[in-house]
């Protein structure tokens, strides 16, 4: 776990909002045709953000590099999910380390 990469990822409000959406995908992405258990399609995240695809892709890449989300390619689509184990480890370390 790279603490600095996680702090960098969390420093941006859009990336924090994406993590909130991915925490409850049923509430934010109910229109997705694929099962949400697979994650949320990058295109759905693009649409909700209201930003260019390249900007959202860069935000998702930062979250992925920090280990906060996982990605899975299915055909032409990429699905993203929160990595709850990494998030828990980060929160535990933050809580106990400061």
Give the role of each language-model region.
Residues 47, 58, 64-65:
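Alpha-helical residues within the helix-turn-helix
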Residues 97-98:
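A common structural junction motif
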């Amino acid at each position: 776990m790279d603490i600095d990469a996680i702090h960098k990822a969390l420093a941006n409000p859009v990336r924090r909002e994406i993590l909130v959406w991915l925490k409850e995908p049923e509430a934010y992405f109910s229109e997705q045709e694929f099962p949400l258990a697979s994650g949320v399609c990058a295109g759905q995240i693009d649409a909700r953000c209201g930003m260019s695809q390249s900007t959202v892709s860069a935000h998702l890449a930062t979250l992925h590099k920090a280990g906060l989300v996982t990605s899975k390619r299915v055909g032409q689509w990429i699905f993203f999910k929160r990595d709850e184990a990494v998030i828990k480890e980060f929160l535990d370390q933050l809580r106990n380390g400061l």
